[in-house]
UniProtKB/Swiss-Prot annotation:
This is Solute carrier family 49 member 4 homolog. The keyword Transmembrane helix applies. The gene is slc49a4. Pfam families: MFS_1 (PF07690). Gene3D superfamilies: MFS general substrate transporter like domains.
Length: 456
């Protein structure tokens, strides 16, 4: 009877037949992790290039508010072919997928550097370059759990996932720092601007940043081309050596799994809104007279704090297994309170909360620490919940939905740019909604059970 309700792939034994092969880890796993993390870092850096310097970009290239929002929107739009990259990772492995991703980033960064005098054409080239960089997003955001399972032992997986997934966010954070510090604001009265001319100096600095990013991306692409194997000679764990479901079966199983959909919404809504919110943080803080440089520092430290906490929490999860849900509840409680504080600060006339640089810094940094810190824990929980569905497919569906919510938020931003306080309310509401979803979620650790209780 049961055979009628299962596919041929699901009736295959989970473990491959044959003699025992003791799991083993290789030192080269750290090189693979380093190259992938560098690629993820650069993709995040390029994606967030324009939001932190939106005032300078308007002056240098005559970008409109719609252009700035669209430059950020190319990130989630780039996730439209996400399912193609998921199929490629599942069928061709890490090397082919990561190489294609790096090539798209090289082409995108190069397109932004084409020296054209016509500003209308230059704007189109920059938009095209951002779109190509957006197409690299599915791999750098999805592949971290797949890479950690393929190369790392069970007591290192959460740490490897945290490092690989957090570096993309760290790249976005460094854009908050690099852009405002290198590119002068249009209202600057520095000697450089007085000597070189405001518009020309700003444009030269922006182009210098784009040339530097292109050069670094090309070097990383060359390194990946030289050495980036899909898998180690011997699997590092029982889970890495086990069979997985087919692509079609995996998609159907994911979409029919209510527990998975519940925890996916708990991730996709707040993290998607947070990505869109942080991408236009400069616009949000402009009405309260926060300068471009100060907004950059706020964005930088909020994401850096989240990256540090995410990696630390990942290491903690490796040390004490089976506590992913309590960690998420703790982090989202902090995120909900911090986002509420930030939102109410903008209503100081009603709430009488002090609106100062210190309160903005503190509340923004806490939001980033708590929300970004949940990413690697979520990824590990997704994989544990739906195992033996491949990690790349699982996280592909998750990040596609996250970018869908980010795209919806930014789409509304292109339509309504007068008062951006509604963005703060969206972020706060999404944190409380996610907290409810996590509290209702029933956790399981199927992959961990296989590694702990089954020996090859």
């Amino acid at each position: 009877m049961g055979l009628e309700w299962s596919s041929p792939g699901e009736r295959q034994p989970l473990l491959y037949p044959g003699g025992p092969r003791a799991p083993r880890v290789f030192g080269r796993r750290w090189l693979v992790l380093l190259l992938f993390s560098l690629l993820a870092f650069l993709q995040g850096l390029v994606w967030n290039s324009w939001g932190p310097i939106q005032n300078s970009a308007r002056t240098a290239y005559n970008f409109s508010g719609l252009d700035i929002a669209l430059l950020v929107l190319w990130g989630p739009i780039g996730f439209l072919p996400c399912f193609l990259f998921m199929w490629l990772m599942d069928n061709r492995g890490l090397r082919v997928t990561v190489l294609l991703t790096a090539l798209l980033m090289v082409l995108g960064a190069g397109l932004r550097c084409v020296p054209v005098q016509d500003l209308a054409v230059r704007r189109k080239l920059i938009h095209g370059g951002q779109l190509l960089n957006g197409f690299a997003g599915p791999t750098v955001m999805n592949a971290a759990p797949f890479l950690s399972t393929t190369w790392f032992s069970p007591d290192e997986r959460a740490t490897a996932t945290a490092i690989a997934s957090m570096l993309s966010y760290l790249g976005g954070a460094c854009a908050f720092l690099v852009g405002p510090l290198v590119v002068p604001a249009p209202n600057s009265t520095s000697g450089l601007l007085l000597y070189s001319g405001s518009v020309g100096a700003i444009r030269d600095r922006i182009e210098a940043v784009m040339y530097a990013e292109f050069g670094i991306i090309f070097v990383v692409f060359a390194a990946i081309l030289a050495y980036f194997p899909s898998r180690p000679p011997v699997p590092p764990s029982v889970a890495a050596a086990s069979r997985r479901l087919s692509y079609r079966t995996s998609i159907l199983r994911l979409l029919s799994n209510v527990r998975f959909l519940l925890i996916v919404l708990a991730y996709a809504i707040p993290l998607g809104f947070y990505a869109g919110w942080s991408g236009v943080l400069d616009l949000i803080l402009t009405p309260v007279h926060v300068t471009q440089v100060d907004a950059g520092w706020v964005g930088f430290w909020s994401i850096v704090g989240g990256c540090v906490v995410g990696i630390a929490v990942g290491r903690f999860a490796d040390s004490i297994r089976g506590v992913l849900k309590p960690i998420l509840l703790l982090l989202f409680s902090g995120a909900a309170l911090s986002s509420t504080w930030f939102t109410l600060t903008f209503l100081s006339n009603v709430t009488h909360l002090p609106l100062t640089t210190a309160t903005l810094y503190t509340s923004c940094i806490l939001i980033g620490v708590f929300l970004s810190g949940t990413v690697p824990i979520f990824f590990e929980m997704f994989v544990e919940t739906v195992y033996p569905i491949p990690e790349g497919i699982t996280c592909g569906v998750v990040t596609f939905l996250s970018n869908l919510f980010m795209g919806v938020l930014l789409l509304f931003l292109t339509l309504y740019q007068t008062n951006l306080s509604w963005l703060n309310w969206c972020l706060t509401g999404s944190c409380f909604l996610s907290l409810l979803f996590i509290a209702c979620f029933r956790e399981s650790y199927d992959r961990l059970y296989l590694d702990v209780f089954v020996s090859v």
